[in-house]
Amino acid sequence: VPETWDDLIAMLPTIQGANMSVGIPYPDIAAPNLSSYYAMLYQLGGALYNDSATHTTINSEAGVQAFERYTSLYNDYGLPTIFDFVSRFRSGEMPLGIFDYTTFNTLTVSAPEIRGLWDIAILPGTSRTAEDGSTYVDHSGHSQGACMMIATDSETTKQNAWQFMKWWTSTDAQVRFGREIEAVLGSSARYATANIAAIEQLSWSEAQLKVIREQMTWAVGFREVAGGYYTTRHMTNAVRKVTNDKTDPRETLLDYARTINEEINKKRLDFGLPIDEETP
């Protein structure tokens, strides 16, 4: 199992020499998935936006390095951009892949013939140097989720909704729901709860829980900002332009970063928020 992205790249000649490949999420049309780029960005010490959320920082040196590394997986190392990971993993064509941990559910049910021959592992990381001079591997990964919101002027409704939210997100409710749905539908319905205490009480093995616990400590999310919808849209455009048209990664990313920042400025003005006088 590769500890770092460099380890993964070093494995590719052996894997590809056996007519196999590795599955890395690509921003396709149906579901633009940039999680691997975001992971590389965080691992290099970068961020998607600046601290005041007034502009994107993908045009930083960390952002450019991460983008060059990510697109090189397809342009330089020949990883596929279109594939069905579950089918290829099951057949052995793709023995390694990086996907959200709920893919475990699908494989458990759809590939019973390889049960016990595979497992989950922590995300490949990037070697970094700490302030004291020691080296460590940064396994930061992109995390996202849903939220519960209350939109009403009624005080009674607010209180009732708040009580419901507290009950639904409680450990007891999450464990009960997770266990009952898995009892009815099987391991394909293993519940991806956001309650950390509830995860410990679901049907994960101790080895799997160890991986999940460790990866959770490296989870990073990015804030929602005014005009933020342009970020994913044009990051996807940038990746496709580099992989399809073979344009220069640095120049392509810098061009789209300017487009993203222009939209962020427009939306901040619409909402009466302060903007950067000189957006980088």
Question: For each of these PLM feature ranges, what is it?
Answer:
Residues 6-55, 62, 94-96:
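Extracytoplasmic/periplasmic solute-binding protein
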Residues 5-14, 51-82, 123-126:
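Glycine-centered hinge/linker elements that transmit conformational signals in sensory
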Residues 121-125, 132-134, 179-241, 272-280:
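Long, aromatic- and glycine/proline-rich binding clefts that accommodate carbohydrate-like moieties
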Residues 16-29, 170-180, 261-275:
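Bilobed periplasmic-binding protein-like "clamshell/Venus-flytrap" ligand-binding domains
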Residues 62-69, 156-168, 176, 252:
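Short amphipathic alpha-helical coupling segments at ligand-binding clamshell hinges
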Residues 12, 165-190:
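Periplasmic-binding protein-like
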Residues 35-39, 43-44, 68-163:
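Extracytoplasmic/periplasmic substrate-binding proteins
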Residues 9-15, 83-97, 237, 241-245:
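Short helices/loops that flank or line small-molecule/ion binding pockets
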